[in-house]
Amino acid sequence: MKNNCFSPEEIIKELDKFLHRNDYENAEKYLLDWLCKSVEADDVNIEILVRNELMGLYRKKGRKDEAFAMVEGVLEKISQKGLHENVGSATTYLNSATVYKAFSEPQKSIALFERAKAIYEKSLNSNDPRFAGLYNNMALTLVDLKRFDQAFDLYERAISVIEEFPERAPDIAITYLNMANAVEAQKGIEEAHEEITEYLKKAEEILENFPDKDGYYAFVCEKCASVFGYYGNFFYENELKERARRIYEGN
């Protein structure tokens, strides 16, 4: 019998305590325990939630086999329960596609992104912020497939969505850095030098002018830092890392 007492919010709240400490070992144990509970209780929503979290955890830790097993398990569950057109399932398709992208399976990745995109376009308003995440992640796979024009189109569409939500402006910085990587992949670093420089300038301008230096901003700084370092701007890389550290420490 399905147990209706399981709270997704409480599960994620407890999980975040492990993740904030980078305690991935106990985060995994916690999630596997909830996976067993959800299967025993036939709580499909909780099972899908937990499998999504586990696939993300395994992706971050580079554990390909376990990540793929979670993807296959959650896709099978969605199929069994007839949830193919559900918006929540679209998010699962997106997460699964990201796993396949991370482990160099772009064809499998793009197929799932296309499924997610079709559901989002049918179910959500065109300026729903979830589109920004879809477009950004899908574009990364399109770059792997050397479908550069489509990738840049999605990056521009992601920016258009994010611009509707000023509090998420730092995500545009991430998009510009993704575009720098994309134009390098398309043309090579020498030919693309001027375009790369322009994308980096745009990203830096956003990061410097964003007013709310909170935990979200710190996360974006950390994510962007290595890209600036990759392109030789070691000073700004270190500045972003230090900025994030100060925010996390509350100074």
Regions found by a protein language model. Give the residues of each.
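Short coil/turn linkers that connect adjacent helices within long alpha-helical scaffolds
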Residues: K2, E40-D43, Q80-H84, K122-S126, ...
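Residues that mark the junctions of alpha-helical repeat units in TPR/alpha-solenoid scaffolds
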Residues: S7, E40, E47, G82, ...
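Conserved alpha-helical positions within TPR/SEL1-like repeat arrays
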Residues: I12-H20, I48-K60, V87-A102, P129-D144, ...
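Amphipathic alpha-helical segments of tetratricopeptide repeats
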Residues: L35-K37, G73-Q80, K117-K122, I159-E164, ...
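Short coil/turn linking the two alpha-helices of tandem helical-hairpin repeats
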Residues: G82, A97, L124, F165-P166, ...
